[in-house]
Amino acid sequence: MFAAICLDEANENQPVYITLKLEPLDGDFLRQQYEDIIPGYYMNKVHWNSIKPDGEVPDELLMEMLDKSYALVLHSFSKKRQQEILLTTYCGLDCTNCEYKEPCKCNGCVATKGMPFHAEETPCPVAACVMQKGISFCGECTEFPCQLLTDYSNDTEHGDNPPGARIAACKMIKCLLEKK
């Protein structure tokens, strides 16, 4: 968990507070700047802070705090667990909101060992390459971004929207896994 949302049942379950993890010094500083940021409800008050979402805290700052909270919590896990959280595909494609996930019972090529719903008899070539090299995802490859991944990412019919999105995702995942 990197955030908790406290809801107001009397007010149609509108958020009363969003509780996020922050570095202790950042939390202290922000609590001094904004009265809508208080020590976290029901949490370790050193690291967790509750923010009134419709208060005086600027949306940009709230988004930045969400990102930092996610990174702090993610990096508290082992590298193996981080990969389990971040990687559902070998190529960086984000399958979490795929319209075929539920009807086709597909959890991405990592879970299906390279055989997602669209791979009928042979594994996806990108997944097969990653598995053959014994790496976790394309971003760990010494040839990244290779021609195979680039071709998949920029394919006009079945590629990314926008083109190159899975390459950018691999770069981001690689950065997240390297930070510690």
Label every PLM stretch briefly.
Residues 1-45, 56:
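Short, conserved beta-strand/beta-arch hydrophobic-aromatic motifs that form part
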Residues 26, 30-33, 47, 61-65, ...:
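Amphipathic alpha-helical interface surfaces
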Residues 39, 53-60, 129-132, 137:
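Short coil/turn segments at secondary-structure boundaries
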Residues 2, 28-32, 71-74, 116-117, ...:
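Structured alpha/beta reader/binder surfaces that contact nucleic acids or chromatin modification marks
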Residues 83-180:
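Cysteine-centered metal-binding/redox modules
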Residues 19-21, 50-52, 140:
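Short, conserved beta-strand segments within well-ordered enzyme catalytic domains
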Residues 7, 53, 143:
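Active-site donor-binding loop signature of nucleotide-sugar glycosyltransferases
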Residues 42-85:
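Well-ordered alpha/beta subsegment
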